[in-house]
Curated annotation (Swiss-Prot):
The keyword Secreted is assigned to this record: yes
Positions annotated with a glycan in the UniProt record: 218, 230, 271
Protein name: Serine protease inhibitor A3A
Organism: Mus musculus
UniProt gene name: Serpina3a
Family designation: Belongs to the serpin family.
Further remarks about this protein from its record: The single human alpha-1-antichymotrypsin gene (SERPINA3) is represented by a cluster of 14 individual murine paralogs.
GO MF assignments: serine-type endopeptidase inhibitor activity
Domains: entry comment: The reactive center loop (RCL) extends out from the body of the protein and directs binding to the target protease. The protease cleaves the serpin at the reactive site within the RCL, establishing a covalent linkage between the serpin reactive site and the protease. The resulting inactive serpin-protease complex is highly stable. Variability within the reactive center loop (RCL) sequences of Serpina3 paralogs may determine target protease specificity.
Pfam families hit by this protein: Serpin
GO cellular component, one term: extracellular space
SMART domains the record matches: SERPIN
Length: 422
């Protein structure tokens, strides 16, 4: 199975004074020369960051689910939090506090410098080629050609967040729109074709954050075994959807009686993983209401290898976009969208606010073969774990999490209510 998630985040400041410059070759200054103890300390901090990101992810998911009832959901909490953290480099005062506290950081206990350092370390580790999964993440700022930025912001944005910048003539909104959309289309391998459609002449900055993920199942789903099966929408309705099927596999499995759901983990080559949360019929609202950071910790601690006779999953493709202007204020991030915003750390000017914040995400779940010897090893390692026949059908609404290969931070999260609805 091949999985691709492509995500774009746009911020536009309409007060005429925002820009920054950064190049694409920025690295995490200092990490290659640090001692092993310090590097180990950073990795431990990155695990803590992943836990904090889980809190943010679940809080944001609940807001999205409330705003989008009866709809499929797909978004990247990691992409959104990284973009907000990057923006906070230029924020001051209450604007800064709102952003970081909205991201679930406890500022008295967590120095701001540590937050940025660990975000940078996390993003850097994600894109390492030895991870085997293909992850491409970064930021781009499209800036008005008349504006100047502060050196400190420029250097930090480049070093910590892999930011690059493009001079843009926003007085020609059609050309500026094409420049941004062409960049996003290229970085997301064509999955997101139009992020911007209504740029105004008084726009001064557009910040794009992208996260592109491609992984290959560590199990085999033969396309010839895909069949049309029933997917239950509610008590009265079902739809016929393509169902991928595989047999005789070992996968991590946990029955959560408290949450009234089945949790199953499928791994990708390279140790990233796809977590299915399959509530009992009619209990998805209960699961959503119960989501807490400790929920993920409990699932990961409780998952055990289980031999399955058969597993069937829906084949689906999702694409959604969200206006975060309406959602982030409910998480406490308000001032940055108002005339009281203080983003003076970008240019030195205080007449800057964010007028538009858009998040688009696309997710494809399909079959992809992997090397046969991988499957053979998986099948023979745990033959003794099979006690009785076990068939798992993901044939009703479910939640899902994509966890990164190193720190198990939530890269992508969402819900499938109807696999046929894009």
């Amino acid at each position: 199975m091949a999985f691709i998630a492509a995500l774009g985040l746009l911020m536009v400041g309409i007060c005429p004074a925002v820009t920054y410059w950064a190049t694409a070759d920025g690295q995490l200054g200092g990490h290659t020369a640090v001692q092993k103890d310090r590097d180990h300390e950073i990795q431990l901090d990155s695990v803590t960051l992943a836990s904090i990101n889980t809190d943010f992810a679940f809080s944001l998911y609940k807001k999205l689910a409330l705003e989008n009832p009866h709809k499929n959901i797909v978004f990247s909490p990691l992409s959104i939090s990284a973009a907000l953290a990057l923006m906070s480099l230029g924020a001051k005062g209450n604007t800064l506090e709102e952003i970081l506290e909205g991201l679930k950081f406890n500022l008295p206990e967590t120095p701001e410098a540590d937050i940025h350092q660990n975000f940078g370390h996390l993003l850097q580790m994600l894109i390492q080629p030895e991870n085997q999964v293909q992850i491409n993440a970064g930021n781009a700022l499209f800036i008005d050609k008349h504006l100047q930025i502060l050196t400190e912001f420029k250097e930090k944005a480049r070093a910590l967040y892999k930011a690059e910048a493009f001079t843009t003539d926003f007085q020609r909104p059609r050309e500026a729109t094409k420049l941004i959309n062409d960049y996003v289309r290229k970085q997301t391998q064509g999955k997101i074709k139009e992020l911007v459609s209504d740029l105004h002449r008084n726009t001064s900055m557009a910040l794009v954050n992208f996260l592109n993920f491609q992984g290959f199942w560590n199990v085999t789903f033969d396309p010839e075994d895909t069949f049309l099966g029933n997917f239950t929408l509610d008590r009265k309705r079902t739809v016929n959807v393509p169902m991928m099927k595989t047999e005789e596999l070992t996968t991590n499995y946990f029955r959560d009686e408290e949450m009234q759901s089945t949790v199953m983990e499928l791994n990708y080559i390279g140790n990233a993983s796809f977590l299915f949360i399959l509530p009992d019929q009619g209990r998805i609202q209960h699961v959503e209401d119960s989501l807490q950071p400790q929920s993920l910790r409990k699932w990961r601690k409780s998952l055990r290898p289980r031999m399955l006779d058969e597993l069937s999953l829906p084949k689906f493709s999702l694409s959604q976009d969200y206006n975060l202007n309406d959602i982030l204020p409910e998480l406490g991030i308000k001032e940055v969208f108002s005339t009281q915003a203080d983003l003076s750390g970008i240019t030195g000017a205080k007449n800057i606010r964010v007028s538009q914040m858009i998040h688009q995400a696309a997710l494809d779940v399909t079959e992809t073969h992997t090397e046969a010897d991988v499957i053979t090893i998986a099948r023979y390692n745990f033959q003794s774990a099979k006690i009785k026949a076990k068939i798992v059908k993901v044939d009703r609404e479910f939640l899902y999490l994509i966890l990164d290969p190193m720190f198990k931070s939530i890269s992508v999260m969402g819900k499938v209510i109807n696999p046929l609805t894009n």
